[in-house]
Amino acid sequence: MELHNDEKRLLKAFQESNEKTMNLEELSKYIEKEKVMRAAFWLSGRDFLEIIENKTKLCELNELGNKSLDFGIPERKVANYIKENNLESIPIKELSKILEKDETGAALGNLKKKGLVEIDKGNIVFKNLNYEDIEEEILKKVSINPDLSTYSKDEVKIVENLKKRGFLNLKEVVDRSFEIKDAGTEFIKNPIEIKEEITQLTREMIVSGKWKDYFIRPYDAKIPTEDIYPAKAHPMSKIIQEVNEVLISMGFKEVKSQIVQTEFWNFDTLFEPQDHPARDMQDTFFVKYPNTGKVPKELLEKVKGIHECGTIDGEKISKGWCYKFDENVSKRTVLRTHTTVSSIKYLASLSESERENPHKVFCIDRVFRNETIDYKHLPEFYQCEGIVMAEDVNFDNLVGILKEFLRKLGFEKVRIRPAYFPFTEPSLEAEVYMEGKGWLELLGAGVFRPEVLEPFGIKKPVLAWGIGLSRLAMLRFGLTDIRELHKNDMEWLKKTAVNE
């Protein structure tokens, strides 16, 4: 094992001093102070050395604290003013003559809190002008002894309060010592030779042959290095990008739709009855302006017939929902509650000839639900939804597509179980297996019902599925609270790998 010269110098310090533990000042006699930490870090990675950190909390007076130490804290200034002028009380409004503007409110509050005054008809009446103030005593102590570890618990509380009042600052000082370990002790039993070394060759060295006089230090790729956190995309953005790339690689085309939709497109076309709980204000954001939108009349009539009695163009295809369909409800505007509306609008836009061709489309975008914010719900989140339309696709194809999609996202174990959704039949939920967590639900899917497709003149089967990307991100990054994705916790953002 070949060590860097700085590592050798540091070990030589232990060898010559015959000490087991040394501090920074002691080591700096053998090696430049700025090189000690780097060499110690390398040696700790080799298990030659242990870096011991002792953290000490210090408190120090700031400008206001020093000023208060000389002239008294605001409460004392008021007491001294009354005492020096032989007054029994002063009007509250006169505090501005004694104190700085930003001291007035705090002084009165602290005088009352400490039980030193009474307020009588707008006047401040002192009970005791010769009181002893523990805060003043602590200010004096801080000026002499900044080491917070020597203070009692009660004194620490007073220090923290003085910090809140702006009299002092707290800081943490790290004192490092270095202890040689068994591997290092074995190494220094032998003489340590320090040769002049170089890390790169120049043309002059090669031509002159001087390179022979130097030791060329080899590179060790296994040496631990300091963590570097370069700029990178937000983890949620990477999830969206990854899902997008996976679907495009599977032959899907991306489609988009507007955030504001009519209830017709968001609910009615999906065969969701107008009295369904999901359409209540408790679950949906209704738009105030514009509060209504345009709905294609011909399609509206077809969807209305499907809802009321299951008929379209006089042909009965189901029982429908057997209720009175309200066209005004269909025209109300909402923030879309799912991205399925993008697929529905895509299907509605297909011409008669285009319906003969197979189609694979998906949408990744924001959706909105009137949810109470908690560890697993947000009112705004990203959803991914896709459809496959072709002559010969069936439920087995849907399962195969989903398993391949999830496999490409890194989930090798997938299981399917039955589910219910108003607009698909049959329907399923896909669960993935994660070590240490077991089986976890991830997405819902199914085959669009005829009541959804018939109004658009589509006779071919359409497979559909949807997945909440926030849920996927939580599983990927090991989060238990969905809010952590959006807290802008810089420490978490720096350390979260986005390429796993």
UniProtKB/Swiss-Prot annotation:
Catalytic activity: tRNA(Phe) + L-phenylalanine + ATP = L-phenylalanyl-tRNA(Phe) + AMP + diphosphate + H(+)
Domain of life where this protein originates: Archaea
GO biological process: phenylalanyl-tRNA aminoacylation
Cofactor binding description: Binds 2 magnesium ions per tetramer.
Residue sites binding L-phenylalanine per the record: 340, 423, 448
Keyword Protein biosynthesis belongs to the record: yes
EC number: 6.1.1.20
Subcellular compartments: Cytoplasm
Molecular function terms, GO-annotated: ATP binding; magnesium ion binding; phenylalanine-tRNA ligase activity; tRNA binding
Keyword Nucleotide-binding: yes
Cofactors, names only: Mg(2+)
GO CC term, one of those recorded: cytoplasm
Subunit structure: Tetramer of two alpha and two beta subunits.
HAMAP family assigned to the protein according to its UniProt record, in alphabetical order: Phe_tRNA_synth_alpha2
PANTHER family with a match to the protein in the record: PHENYLALANINE--TRNA LIGASE ALPHA SUBUNIT (PTHR11538:SF40), PHENYLALANYL-TRNA SYNTHETASE (PTHR11538)
Family of this protein: Belongs to the class-II aminoacyl-tRNA synthetase family. Phe-tRNA synthetase alpha subunit type 2 subfamily.
Name by which UniProt lists this protein: Phenylalanine--tRNA ligase alpha subunit
Organism of origin: Methanococcus maripaludis (strain DSM 14266 / JCM 13030 / NBRC 101832 / S2 / LL)
Gene it is expressed from: pheS
